[in-house]
Amino acid sequence: MREESWEDHDTIQLTAQRKYLAEVQALETLLTRELSAFLTEPGSKKTNIINRITGKTYALPSTELLRLYEHLEQCRKQGALMYFLERQGTYSGLMLDYDLKLNTNAVPPLEPPALSRLCHRIFVHIKNSSVLPEGSHKIHFFFTLKPEVVQGKYGFHVLIPGLKLAASTKKSIIGSLQHDATVQKILHEQGVANPESCLDPHSASVPSLLYGSSKLNHKPYQLKTGFELVFDSSDPDYIPIHQIKNIESYNLVSELSLTNEQGSLVRPVYCAADIAAEKEEEIPTDDHSLSILMLHDPEARYLHKILNLLPPEYYVEYPLWSNVVFALANTSANYRPLAEWFSQKCPEKWNTGGKEKLEKLWNDASRHTEKKITKRSIMYWAHKHAPQQYKEIVEQGYFSILAEYVYSYNGMLEHYMIAKVIYAMMGNKFVVDVDSNGKYVWFEFVLPGQPMNQGEIWKWRKEVNPDELHIYISENFSRVMDRITEHIKYHLSQPHETNILNYYKKLLKAFERSKSKIFNDSFKKGVIRQAEFLFRQRSFIQTLDTNPHLLGVGNGVLSIETIPAKLINHFHEHPIHQYTHICYVPFNPENPWTKLLLNALQDIIPELDARLWIMFYLSTAIFRGLKEALMLLWLGGGCNGKTFLMRLVAMVLGDHYASKLNISLLTSCRETAEKPNSAFMRLKGRGYGYFEETNKSEVLNTSRLKEMVNPGDVTARELNQKQESFQMTATMVAASNYNFIIDTTDHGTWRRLRHYRSKVKFCHNPDPGNPYEKKEDPRFIHEYIMDPDCQNAFFSILVYFWEKLQKEYNGQIKKVFCPTIESETEAYRKSQDTLHRFITERVVESPSAETVYNLSEVVTAYAEWYNANINVKRHIALELSQELENSVLEKYLQWSPNKTRILKGCRILHKFETLQPGESYIGVSTAGTLLNTPICEPKNKWWEWSPNLSAPPEKEASAPTP
């Protein structure tokens, strides 16, 4: 059997001693029932007793103090752990705290002769710093020693409880003692390496431990000896001193108290303060917040140990230190004491504004919750730098939590108790939240080495049932329980009293019965049900995949927030659940698959400017935030590669990020508000959506079109689900063998559309003289599109164009110069929108024109043009006026003084009339004519070109439009 460390013993013994020590039970009864009337608020000046175990503070009168001292003395004699402090009052005894660094690891002798000499020197400084009362007085000195030397460090306290001094007087005494050469010589003779700096200057006013009490995870100081010094003001030079005999016969908790005035041995001697003491000082009520936090919060104790594993750079270098502070703040607002303690590990920085920096950083962390670093990161850093020590601490933490339950409930373990330990073990790996149907849903953070589907690594996987927890309870948890058995048997082997041994025997018997439950299916299901409440992280589901710059990929998480994109293939705290199975690899144009695809793109879209624009546009599919309000309409008669390209984008992004959409979504009438629309819900959270293969002459529903393209919130619902609101984030492409019919003159709709017409056709036997006929390769459709290497290469191409778009065009598609698509869009609009055709053919911008047209005159001119060029029909003037106000003429329309609309700065041409100097057509300069199609040479690095108003690369050649 191995004895547990003192730290283990400390936390477990606190629980166990309540069961078998009647003295401890009596003390708890006294505190909870009889002394509760004397409780004070933390920080109250009335406080004189602090209970570190509970964090409660008391203002006890002298009679109740004596009762408390009696109970504490009985507990001390039984070896009970205690954590009581007394607050030093305005006048109280003197405590000197010596923290020694030794030349060796041997305990210094500190024999009575040396301690007697030390008493004389201390008294000299007392006489010099205060006014002792007239008459003869006995002054008692007590020496309490640290139980053992730890890494060359040792300590002792000098207690002078009867001498009642002001705080300022104590500080004066301590200040002069620090420079006493005789005292330093005495300490040096005891093997002390730091005699000049070992006296703690803060011991004058901080709360002092009552005798028998200790700091958390430390043994209490033990009384070495005591001395009685006699001072008579009538003969101040004669100061006899002798060692106190039978000292253990007294109530030492009472006698060594700095505030007690009714001791049997020690009687109070009140000393007048010096001049500096006349102004009453406020005595600090140091609440030892870190100690109290660690007593009450097992996780805080655990984090304290974990933080100790971090190397110095984490508290020296600002970026790493700030991450630790953010992690603590995001984990719990109560962990501020941990942040202070960790920051003080670098005294140089702490003493030069460190506290102020921590204050600011802590407040920033509280306000800016988007920086999601929590304790999970601290665990990762500690495991990374000290894996073996980390493992030991983690295992010890599980043991301590379970042991507390075992000792508190006499060995009987229930579902919640096991769940609590499981949460400590697996709380960083599993999360539970409630979904929209009110059901508890488990999520597991997938790590390397465990079974998974492609793409799940480094992401939160949804679990129908946490099977790993079921297995873990039976196979791993049993090892922790075996340590509890070992711990109980260790105590049974010790020479305890009969009642204590009987307690451990009963405990072991009950615990062995509990151990077998972890192999029972029903019991484990009960544990899992209780664990749901512990693992619950509210709104976790709502936070999943909300960062539009993060994309789950096959080998981790891709961040496109910075340029270049960054692959996160290690531990992180981004709540990512969705993913594509594609692995991210940086763009490499020399990669064979990349070369193949770049050449294929060159064949599919022969115009350089159009090819670049379309690739920029498609690259925005990897971003799931709000985008420019655009939709690409792609016309092609078949066998031209448009379907291959659109499907490849969707296949690369996967079903979580892309969706093929039903064309009826664009062509059908909108459903009523209360009806479901599963097709529309397919756009929720998607970065890409595409339509393909429509029937001839499909008429688009323009109101639905605007709703889908406009950035902003929309509402819809799935069948049997509640109405949801979500943002439209998809990059959308609609492909067809036939032109869509868009029956609107609304400029707000048309400015959101871009149109491209395929020119190339892939044939089995292409005409060598026709540059727009290419040799078909069925492998693209049946083989390449399914190849993971091909998909990875195409994904790298998308990321490359996304980065290029951000760097060169500030992420804005509309800044990309593309005369081919602009011209084709204009031509398409004119074929659909007769009003726009009239405007682009007959209305010109004429800054020098003096003629001003009433809107009714423009309506008349359009009606005459329509009847002459399109068809004779009856026009409704009011409707035409409204259409003109929503057309490209909108910016030229003004209000006249008589509140009518007028057209200014333009001129309406008559038939066969030409432009005058300074005039220009409204719309694209080519007036909708198709541009010549540039054909790129196969080896031209077309992807490096940046479209602007300059000419294309030299290797581009021109060919007539087919």
From Swiss-Prot:
The enzyme class is hydrolase
Protein name (database record): Putative primase C962R
Which keywords annotate this record? ATP-binding, DNA replication, Helicase, Hydrolase, Late protein, Nucleotide-binding
Indicate the family of this protein: Belongs to the asfivirus helicase C962R family.
Q: Which GO terms describe its molecular function?
A: ATP binding; helicase activity; hydrolase activity, acting on acid anhydrides
Q: Membrane-spanning residues where?
A: none
Source species, please? Answer: African swine fever virus (strain Badajoz 1971 Vero-adapted)
Domain of life according to the entry: Viruses
